[in-house]
């Protein structure tokens, strides 16, 4: 059974790690101490080269704790303008790390990335977060314009989850 942590009585897990991997591990380990079976922790975000990797692990809180996706995008575009990196082509990547744990033991961490560029205007309304300004390599559309099926095939999270699924298959079936 798959459950969202928000649907449990587990206390909020503080993301105080210094990397996506640390945060994913913190989440998975903490939740696995309260829930039976295999538990997955996830952390992900956008890294923009012109901003030395920002927003990075602060992607969700980049424009403030309760900021909307639009406010996060606006802040990112302002920061790019501030450092003179305007235009349609700043190199960036989405990175996701998923960690697998059970009964307080870490079973593995798996990373997925998708390289691309940041556009200077939001395009599309699919997805969430920074999707409307990220164009993955090999495409002209932003994540906000791509179908869910295409995005899941190439996305950072899809890649990380597929790597994790291979590990779970080995644990469960000895493959």
Q: Predicted segment positions?
A:
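Anionic-ligand binding patches
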Residues: 1-175
């Amino acid at each position: 059974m798959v459950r969202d942590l928000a649907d449990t009585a587990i206390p909020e897990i503080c993301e105080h790690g210094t990397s996506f991997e640390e945060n994913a591990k913190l989440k998975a380990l903490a939740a696995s101490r309260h829930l039976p079976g295999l538990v997955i922790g996830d952390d992900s975000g956008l890294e923009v080269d012109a901003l030395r990797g920002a927003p990075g692990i602060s992607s969700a809180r980049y424009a403030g704790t309760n900021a909307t996706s639009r406010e996060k995008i606006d802040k990112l575009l302002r920061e790019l303008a501030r450092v003179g990196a305007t235009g349609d082509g700043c190199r960036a990547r989405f990175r996701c790390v998923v960690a697998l744990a059970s009964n307080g033991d870490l079973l593995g961490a798996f990373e997925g990335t998708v390289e691309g560029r940041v556009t200077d205007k939001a395009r599309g309304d699919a997805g969430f977060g920074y999707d409307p300004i990220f164009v993955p390599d090999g495409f002209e559309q932003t994540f906000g314009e791509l179908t869910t099926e295409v995005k899941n095939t190439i996305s950072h999270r899809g890649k990380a989850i597929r790597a994790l699924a291979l590990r779970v298959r080995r644990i469960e079936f000895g493959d």
